[in-house]
Structures are given as structure tokens and as C-alpha cells.
A protein has these predicted regions:
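Short, positively charged low-complexity motifs
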Residues: 1-4, 17
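Serine residues within intrinsically disordered or low-complexity segments
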Residues: 7-10, 21, 26-27
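DEDD superfamily 3′-5′ metal-dependent exonuclease/proofreading module
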Residues: 24-74, 78-240
Length: 240
């Protein structure tokens, strides 16, 4: 639990939920339902002062839609992989979140994303803070799971972790002042498994000899997000 409040940030409430996941019996292919407790911390406007999330932080965003110039940032969720999810509600018109921005720009903190291109752009558009360094599980998936075109987070969790996450709240009103328990649980699930996925992808990227090219993609990702915002969202600037 968090003991201190940030100046300009307030704790709304902390709740413990149970994320239902599928895990195999040790004997083989039969699967059983396993409960994984997750504590959700909900804040207003920014992370609280003094909160430390460690050297590797999973991050995801919820917005009012998919157009960053039209649809505002509503929620940023984070986890350091310890079973805690930290959710920050962003108000309409808010243009600064100092503690969150410091985390995004901290060169000693690796930020984990799934489809980071969108999240990096959304937060840069809102606060002017460019996340780096980064790791994107969707890019990693496309580099090593070439046997499929299904690279969604739900697909990765099912195949690689034997976990089934719900996407029912993906399209909902994230700008509401009071989020439902279902929304908070959904938001938490989007960051709870990225650390495990990263570990597995690091092994696969090394196995397939694609770790170096993956790192180059991750290094370029913040610039790709800026290009999206600057007017080149669907254009390959490297094309003839």
C-alpha cells in the first residue's frame, strides 16, 4: 500500500481483486482455473510522491478513442510485476503529470509496452514526455512468432503463459469520473503479465538470432510515435 500522497495527486482507493487465469496441471494438458490476487491502487492526476516501481515498469494507456489528436488520454496503468497495479486517472485538459513524466523519461527505467507505439504517442501528446528506453512485446512477437498473424496481448498470454485475460472492457467510457470494478480489473490485467512475456521473448529473440534487430526497433519506437503525431501515421518514410 502507498503511504504518501503526491502533491497534486490523490489516492482514490486501493482494492484487491482476483484475476482469473488458466494454468495447466503439472501432469499434462488439462487446464485448471487459478486465482491470482492483484492489488489495484487508483490515483488522480499523477503518481504519488515517493512511489518507486523498480527498474522495469509495465505501462499501458486507455483513451477515449484511437485518434491521438481527437481522443484524450484517460488512464495510465503501471506495474513492476509484483502483483500491484497502479492506475492514474487523467482529467480532461490535464497537460502535466510530473512524477509520471519523470518515470517515462528516466534513462535507468525500462518501460514495457504491448503496442507501445500507441501508448508512447498518447502520453507524449498529453504531457510532452517521451518514454525511453522501451521494450514492446508486440514487436517482439512479430519478430519471433512468424508462424501466426495473431499478436494481440490476449493471444500472447494464452499461448505463452496459459493465461486467459478478458478484453470485454476494451471499448468502454474511460473518461468516466468513476471507473467500474470491471474497468479497473481490465486495466490491471493489461500490465500484470508483460514482465513474464518479456523474459520469454528475450529467450526466443536470442534463439532466433534477432535480439539485435529487436533492440534497434525498440530504440526507434519513440521516434516512430513522434512521426505518427507529426503527420506520418500510415506512411513508411523508408519506402521508395
Amino acid at each position: 500500500m502507498v503511504d504518501a500522497l503526491a502533491s497534486g495527486a490523490s489516492i482514490r482507493k486501493d482494492v484487491e481483486v482476483r484475476v482469473l487465469s488458466w494454468a495447466p496441471f503439472s501432469s499434462g494438458g488439462i487446464r485448471m482455473m487459478e486465482e491470482k490476487p492483484v492489488t489495484i491502487h487508483l490515483y488522480k492526476n499523477d503518481l504519488p510522491d515517493g512511489l518507486t516501481l523498480g527498474p522495469i515498469v509495465a505501462i499501458d494507456c486507455e483513451t477515449m478513442g484511437l485518434n491521438p489528436h481527437r481522443d484524450r488520454l484517460c488512464l495510465v496503468q503501471m506495474s513492476d510485476g509484483d502483483g500491484n497495479a497502479h492506475l492514474v486517472q487523467i482529467e480532461k485538459g490535464q497537460s502535466a503529470a510530473p512524477n509520471l513524466s519523470r518515470l517515462l523519461e528516466d534513462p535507468d527505467t525500462l518501460k514495457l509496452f504491448h503496442f507501445g507505439r500507441f501508448d508512447i504517442a498518447a502520453m507524449y501528446n498529453a504531457f510532452g514526455a517521451l518514454a525511453a528506453p522501451v521494450f514492446c512485446t508486440k514487436i517482439a512477437s512479430k519478430l519471433v512468432r512468424t508462424y501466426t498473424d495473431r499478436h494481440g496481448l490476449k493471444n500472447l498470454c494464452q499461448e505463452m503463459l496459459n493465461i486467459d485475460i478478458s478484453k470485454q472492457q476494451q471499448s468502454s467510457d474511460w473518461g468516466a469520473p468513476d471507473l467500474s470494478e470491471a474497468q479497473k480489473t481490465y486495466a490491471a490485467s493489461d500490465v500484470m503479465y508483460l514482465h513474464q512475456l518479456r523474459d520469454l521473448f528475450i529467450e526466443r529473440l536470442a534463439r532466433e538470432g534477432r535480439a539485435e534487430i529487436a533492440q534497434a526497433c525498440f530504440d526507434f519506437l519513440p521516434i516512430r510515435a513522434r512521426l505518427d503525431l507529426a503527420g506520418w501515421p500510415e506512411i513508411d518514410i523508408f519506402a521508395h
